[in-house]
Design a protein with these regions (language model features):
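Active-site proximal loop and beta-alpha junction motif in alpha/beta enzyme cores
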Residues: 4-72, 82-142
Length: 142
């Protein structure tokens, strides 16, 4: 895989890696994500996005979040990818950029004043039940 990286901070740190091949998924994403997300160059950890330009305003992206691993989508990650694409000349400033993630497509616009706008659907992807067992306080604790 041939990659070039860009560091971007959009409230949290992101390492955006551009590739000519489809972005990694599954075990390959996990291997790259763990290695880069916890690299000594990033002492607090970093979110990692792999992005393949698929059109002048389209990017296929997979995400490895530093706190949770592979995710279906990431709003700040989509913004970081679009910003990096604009800053490196891969996508035009001021135009809607479609960021295709495993969980759906988000539209990001990096405006001329560097404001970044994100538009996309919010959808429930999981549901479940959590059973919390009461615990006894240790002796001497009230």
């Amino acid at each position: 895989m041939c990659i070039r990286d860009s560091g971007v901070a959009v409230g949290n740190p992101h390492c955006v890696l551009f590739t000519h091949e489809p972005p990694p998924a599954g075990a390959e994403l996990a291997a790259w994500g763990r290695a880069l997300g916890h690299h000594p160059a990033f002492p607090g950890g970093i979110n990692v996005e792999f992005a393949q330009p698929i059109s002048p305003t389209g990017l296929a992206v997979t995400v490895w979040e530093r706190g949770s691993g592979a995710t279906l989508a990431c709003g700040t990650g989509a913004c970081a990818v679009a910003a990096a694409a604009v800053l490196t000349g891969r996508c035009p400033r001021g135009a809607p950029i479609l960021v295709q993630l495993p969980g759906g497509t988000l539209e990001v616009c990096v405006q001329r004043d560097d404001t970044v706008l994100l538009t996309g659907d919010a959808a429930a992807t999981f549901s479940g039940t959590v059973l919390i067992q009461p615990c006894k306080a240790p002796r001497g604790v009230v």
